[in-house]
Amino acid sequence: MTLDDIERGIVLTIDKPYGWTSFQVVNKIKWQIKRELGLKKFKIGHAGTLDPLATGVLLVCVGKATKRIDELQGGRKIYTGTIVLGATTPCFDLERAIDAYYPTAHITESLIKETALRFVGEIEQVPPMFSADKVDGERAYSYARDGEQVEIAPKKVSIDSFEITAIRNLGSDTPVPPLSTLSAPASDTSEKELYRHPQGIVPPMLPQVDFRICCGKGTYIRSIARDFGLALGSGAFLSSLRREQVGIYSLSDSIQVQSGTDVSF
C-alpha cells in the first residue's frame, strides 16, 4: 500500500480470522499503515461487522474509501455455516454455553428443507440480545451482559435464498449430556480471551444442518438459526459461520490476517 492508495481510497477484502472482533482487524491494519507509511492520521473503518466467532469477508475501507461504507454495507451477502438443532444458547451461537435442550425426533429431512423455504423473501426478525443493535441509546449486548432483559424491536430483512447443503445426525436417540458439562470453566477464560475460547461445546449427537444463505443488509444469521429452530418445533443455534461474499468482493480476492505477522497488502 502506498500514500497514493490512501489519497485515492482503497477497499481491502480481509478474510477475518476466527476469534477476532472486526475492530481488532481494523486496528491491526491501522497500526501497520501508520508504521509503514509514517502517517499519524487517516480515516479507516469497516463496512459490516462480523461476529467474533464468524470468519470470512470483512471489507476494510481506508482513506476516501470510508465515504463508501454505507454503499458497501448494502451489498448482498453470501454465508455458509452450520446450525445445531435440539438446543439453544443465550446468544444464539457458541459465545455462551447451551442453556436448554428441545425434542428433535419429529424432525425429518423434508421438514428441514420445507422450513428453509419459508425464510426466503422479506421477513421480520428480532436481533439477538448479544448484538450491537441499540435499545434506548445503549447497545443491546450491554444489557445482556448485565443480565437485563429488554425488548428489541423486530426489523425487516431480505433473504434471497436459504439452501440446505447437508444434514447430519437426524433421528439420533443418543442421550445428551448434562448442561453442567457443556461449558468451559469461567475462571479459565478472561473477558479478553472469551472469543478465543468459546464457552459453548456442541454435543456430537445433536442434529446438524449445513446451509448457504444469500441475504441483504442487516440480516443476523444467528437470529435465523434461532427462528429456524422455533419453526421446526424445537430449538437451534449457530455453531459456525463464514461470510463468502459481500457485493462484488469475495474470499477468492481476500487478504489473510494473522497474529504476530504483518498483513500483505
Task: Indicate where each model-derived feature is located.
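Catalytic/RNA-binding core of pseudouridine synthases
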Residues: 1-265
